[in-house]
Amino acid sequence: MTNGQEPIAMLIAVSSADRLDLWQAIVLGFVQGATEFLPISSTAHLKVVPVVLGWGDPGVAFTAVIQLGSIVAVLSYFRQDLTYVLRGLVSAVRRQDFRSEPAQMGLGILFGTIPILIGGLLIKRFIPDYDNSPLRSLAAIAIVSIVMGLLLGIAEQLSKHQRDLSQLRLADGLWMGFAQALALIPGVSRSGSTLTAGLFQGLKRDTAARFSFLLGIPAITIAGLVELKDLLEAGIDGSSLGVLAIGTLSSLIFSWLAIAWLLRFLRTHNTWSFVVYRIIFGGVILTAIATGTLQNI
């Protein structure tokens, strides 16, 4: 920077990585990986867990960068699905006919990514100190967790659970894309909001989850790369880079395991366990804040 002043986001990014050690990075990578693809909000848990353990909030930048591990996991797990969609899109462009299953899925992913990209740009432009925003307070996260848990429960109850990937259309991608944009609010859960939207559209549980994972690839990748770029421009040192690398690797491993487990689980189970968990999670946090056990930061 020519004026010697770094953007607030860069300073936050560096300080977040600097104050973590390797063990903490492994734990946070586990939290990120285990919760990124479950409908319980990885952002909420990455905020709450380190605060409860006395480590402080790792910040938006650290969270975004280690999400790259989750992206590598989802790219690896769904490599055949992605190849199928990409080939279908290329074929659709050549034939000028986008009615095929892979073309509809591909268009759903592309257009469904637009809302969260716009929302992310607006936040970066108008809320530069987002780390300290009231939306990231523990109380706000707890309330949002409860509300989204209730919405998931309503969707579970009302959904017909009949439609599979072969019946997925562009409109489903757009609907789930707008739901994904809500995940910019900490505690919403990108996986949870898109799964909820998919259930409202009548998708089968594992179908909604599968498309949710594919839909998240562009947005999470872009967010992670932008924050990584800011970190490198801010002049992060080798030790901090090592912490980020360990956190990202941990995130990759546990993300892959979480994806495999959730898809198997949703083939034979409903989502009520996640609904109950989210309500209890939010209730415990609010109770801890009310009793002074936990500081609302």
Curated annotation (Swiss-Prot):
It comes from Synechococcus sp. (strain ATCC 27144 / PCC 6301 / SAUG 1402/1) (Anacystis nidulans). The chain crosses the membrane at residues 58-78, 103-123, 138-158, 168-188, 208-228, 243-263, 274-294. Belongs to the UppP family. Keywords: Antibiotic resistance, Cell inner membrane, Cell membrane, Cell shape, Cell wall biogenesis/degradation, Hydrolase, Membrane, Peptidoglycan synthesis, Transmembrane, Transmembrane helix. It is an enzyme of class 3 (hydrolase). Catalyzes the dephosphorylation of undecaprenyl diphosphate (UPP). Confers resistance to bacitracin. The keyword Mitochondrion does not apply. The keyword Transferase does not apply. One of its GO terms (molecular function) is undecaprenyl-diphosphatase activity. The lineage of its organism: Bacteria, Bacillati, Cyanobacteriota, Cyanophyceae, Synechococcales. The gene is uppP. PANTHER family: UNDECAPRENYL-DIPHOSPHATASE. It is found in: Cell inner membrane. InterPro entries: UppP. Disulfide bonds: none annotated. Its main location: membrane. GO terms for cellular component: plasma membrane. Pfam families: BacA. This is Undecaprenyl-diphosphatase. Its EC number is 3.6.1.27. Bacitracin is thought to be involved in the inhibition of peptidoglycan synthesis by sequestering undecaprenyl diphosphate, thereby reducing the pool of lipid carrier available. GO terms for biological process: cell wall organization; peptidoglycan biosynthetic process; regulation of cell shape; response to antibiotic. It is a multi-pass membrane protein.
